[in-house]
Amino acid sequence: MSSSLSQTSKYQATSVVNGLLSNLLPGVPKIRANNGKTSVNNGSTAQLIDRNLKKRVQLQNRDVHKIKKKCKLVKKKQVKKHKLDKEQLEQLAKHQVLKKHQQEGTLTDHERKYLNKLIKRNSQNLRSWDLEEEVRDELEDIQQSILKDTVSTANTDRSKRRRFKRKQFKEDIKESDFVKDHRYPGLTPGLAPVGLSDEEDSSEED
């Protein structure tokens, strides 16, 4: 009777341990009770649990570090954006005041100096932008000109070659049509005049 109770208690304890392992450390091998014996001894099981617990703690710490770092970056961006928005609003309000004082003719010396400085800086920026735009436009014009000249030169060369070939062809035809025999004008070489036999031709040559 006591042996049966002891066996039942062991099964219950094993089930409780396995339940805890599956909740806390998923994937950890379960302990199996077999005739009062476990497939894994207590020492190795304790080491396995300890190792997995340490690994889980490391993962949790790493996740916490990542979360903190991400939150810090988000907060930093928010602070930077808030500061930029605040500066822009302050600058806008200041410019509106300067504009009003300028229209009313009530600019102070300090405001006048600041306004002149602002105008000068904006003028320099505009000149810089204009210069960059001008250089960019000029480069584009040069590229287009080079491309146009290249295409035009290629077309001109092809046109010249075609004209030369046509001219040469016409001259060749003309020469072939008007080749004269030096003894009988109007006849092509190798043909004797009408009425002149081969014998007469031979006697004449003698």
Swiss-Prot record:
What's this chain's function?
Answer: Involved in ribosome biogenesis, probably through modulation of rDNA transcription.
Question: Is-annotated flag, keyword Transcription?
Answer: yes
Annotated protein name in UniProt: Regulator of rDNA transcription 14
Superkingdom field = Eukaryota
Q: Where in the cell is it found?
A: Nucleus, Nucleolus
Entry keyword set: Nucleus, Phosphoprotein, Transcription, Transcription regulation
Region annotation (Disordered) maps to 178-206
- Tell me which family the UniProt entry assigns to this protein: Belongs to the RRT14 family.
One Gene Ontology cellular component term attached to this UniProt record is: nucleolus
Query: Acidic residues: which segments have biased composition?
Result: 197-206
In the record, Phosphoserine modifications are located at: S197, S202, S203
